[in-house]
Curated annotation (Swiss-Prot):
UniProt-listed InterPro entries: Kunitz_BPTI, Kunitz_BPTI_sf, Prtase_inh_Kunz-CS, TFPI/VKTCI-like
GO molecular function: potassium channel regulator activity; serine-type endopeptidase inhibitor activity; toxin activity
Source organism per UniProt: Bungarus multicinctus
Name of the protein this chain belongs to: Kunitz-type serine protease inhibitor homolog beta-bungarotoxin B1 chain, major component
Upper classification of the organism: Eukaryota, Metazoa, Chordata, Craniata, Vertebrata
Membrane-crossing residue ranges in chain numbering: none
CDD domains: Kunitz_B2B
Length: 85
């Protein structure tokens, strides 16, 4: 990953952490759903929240008709689905 990409990733993580106070965070409503790859469009890499492992994992998403537990980046998945006590 280039230094620009790393800087962008760091910025997104910081923004996510700063905008949403930990005590008031609620998990995205679809994070508890199983991954659904959808059924149309080209396959692309996306991320889903694995409730058993409590982490975001990559999977192949087909672009439509899946549920809401799919995110373009691991960072977005973590921002939406990880809730800290």
């Amino acid at each position: 990953m280039s230094s620009g990409g790393l800087l962008l990733l760091l910025g997104l993580l910081t923004l996510c952490a700063e905008l949403i106070p930990v005590s008031s965070r609620q998990r995205h409503r679809d994070c508890d759903k199983p991954p659904d790859k959808g059924n149309c469009g080209p396959v692309r890499r996306a991320f889903y929240y694995d409730t058993r492992l409590k982490t975001c994992k990559a999977f192949q998403y087909r672009g439509c008709n899946g549920n809401g537990n799919h995110f373009k980046t691991e960072t977005l998945c973590r921002c939406e689905c990880l809730v800290y006590p």
